[in-house]
């Protein structure tokens, strides 16, 4: 996964920088975990207790205060991780880590996670906004009022803690969906096999389904990681398009179609304790520190829950209440589609659609790349 390589690059940069900044570590501020802290916007006092592992348990008198405090505490623990994720989906990594982040920046700009998330945010219901906004306010309260507590890693890597918006929470969901559902790479491979070998021979190497717009899958053909394929298009345009996409996504090889995550439920009749049990294994890389999930306990009237969520998302993604346990299982299903446009041979600035020649919409963006040899240490 490209995130792993980015984190490794950041880790290498951090090791180099450590020799220059080691003396700051012992004196750098650590988030306050005792005493009273001011959190603007609370309607009643909130208590945060931490166990021996540092896991926070938040006790509030109402749900908005609970979510506001969760945002605050999450920023205390994982602000660097949150800012790293945001810089990744916004395509701003190269400005901090140089050439190592450029491929990721190009990929994110092409996918348009940031723009799509802002459009999605405009469609949020009032209930969704009421759930998300207190969390955002809590994150920003920590960023604004506790600048001295910000993680040392932010300065080492060159990232700034910026105010968060509702769109950032939506973008995180889009980003996680992208990183955990990558069958589009298998679709590109399937299309290339079909173009070079023909659909029948390609199907012997990789399960695939015919394009539903031209023919339904016949008996014996199954949906698969390869997804739908189109009939071999003209060489002009389509091959160029696939080649361009391949260049953008070459660092990410297709996943093995046999992997996935799992949940295991044990009935009370079969457990040693006499109680039902749920074991959840989301299959996330445990070599990445901090981990993808942030463990937390949430307690308010009507809410008694412990579990974990992604840093940047309120509530819980997996965990348990006094009534039920729930988990996350990734099936790596066919949830992404790749569309290959055919260039107009008479005008490469146009593409063909239904016999018509239509102009491409251009969206030119500049990507800043950290470069010690460039004026001001940055090039575009």
Regions found by a protein language model. Give the residues of each.
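Ser/Thr- (and often Asn-) enriched beta-sheet segments in non-cytosolic proteins
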Residues: 153, 207, 364-368, 379-380
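Short helix/loop capping segments that flank catalytic or ligand/cofactor-binding pockets
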Residues: 59, 67-69, 274-275, 286-290, ...
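Compact, glycine/acidic-enriched structural inserts
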Residues: 301-377
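N-terminal Sec-pathway targeting helices
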Residues: 1-15
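Substrate-recognition/specificity elements adjacent to catalytic centers across diverse enzyme folds
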Residues: 5, 19-277, 282, 289, ...
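Hydrophobic cores of alpha-helical transmembrane segments in multi-pass integral membrane proteins
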Residues: 13-21, 317
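Short secondary-structure boundary/capping segments
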Residues: 157, 167-178, 292-297, 332-335, ...
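Residues that flank catalytic or metal-binding motifs in active/ligand-binding sites
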Residues: 260-262, 273, 292-294, 313, ...
């Amino acid at each position: 996964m490209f995130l792993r390589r980015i984190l490794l690059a950041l880790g290498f940069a951090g090791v180099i920088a450590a020799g220059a900044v080691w003396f700051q570590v012992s004196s750098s501020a650590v988030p306050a975990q005792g005493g009273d802290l001011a959190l603007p916007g609370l309607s009643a006092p909130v208590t945060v207790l931490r166990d021996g592992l540092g896991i926070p348990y938040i006790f509030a008198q109402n749900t908005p205060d609970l979510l506001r405090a969760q945002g605050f505490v999450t920023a205390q623990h994982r602000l660097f991780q949150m800012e790293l994720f945001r810089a990744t989906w916004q395509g701003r990594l190269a400005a901090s880590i140089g050439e190592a982040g450029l491929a990721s920046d190009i990929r994110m700009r092409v996918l348009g996670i940031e723009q799509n998330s802002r459009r999605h945010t405009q469609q949020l219901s009032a209930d969704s906004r009421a759930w998300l906004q207190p969390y955002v306010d809590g994150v920003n309260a920590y960023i604004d009022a506790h600048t001295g507590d910000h993680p040392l890693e932010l300065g080492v890597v060159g990232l700034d803690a910026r105010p968060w918006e509702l769109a950032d929470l939506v973008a995180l969901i889009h980003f996680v969906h992208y990183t955990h559902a990558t069958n589009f790479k298998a679709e590109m491979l399937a299309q290339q096999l079909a173009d070079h070998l023909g659909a029948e021979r390609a199907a012997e190497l990789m399960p695939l389904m015919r394009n539903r717009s031209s023919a339904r899958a016949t008996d014996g053909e199954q949906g698969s990681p390869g997804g739908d394929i189109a009939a071999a298009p003209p060489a002009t345009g389509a091959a160029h398009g696939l080649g361009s996409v391949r260049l953008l996504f070459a660092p990410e090889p297709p996943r093995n179609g046999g992997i996935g995550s799992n949940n295991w439920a044990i009935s009370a009749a079969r457990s040693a304790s006499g109680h039902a049990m749920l074991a959840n294994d989301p299959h996330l890389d445990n070599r990445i520190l901090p981990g993808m999930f942030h463990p937390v306990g949430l307690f308010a009237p009507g809410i008694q829950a412990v579990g974990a969520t992604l840093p940047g998302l309120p509530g819980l993604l997996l965990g348990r209440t006094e009534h039920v346990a729930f988990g996350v299982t990734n099936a790596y299903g066919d949830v992404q589609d790749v569309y290959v446009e055919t260039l107009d041979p008479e005008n490469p600035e146009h593409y063909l659609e239904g016999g018509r020649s239509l102009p491409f919409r251009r969206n030119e963006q500049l990507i800043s790349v950290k470069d010690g040899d460039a004026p001001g240490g940055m090039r575009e």
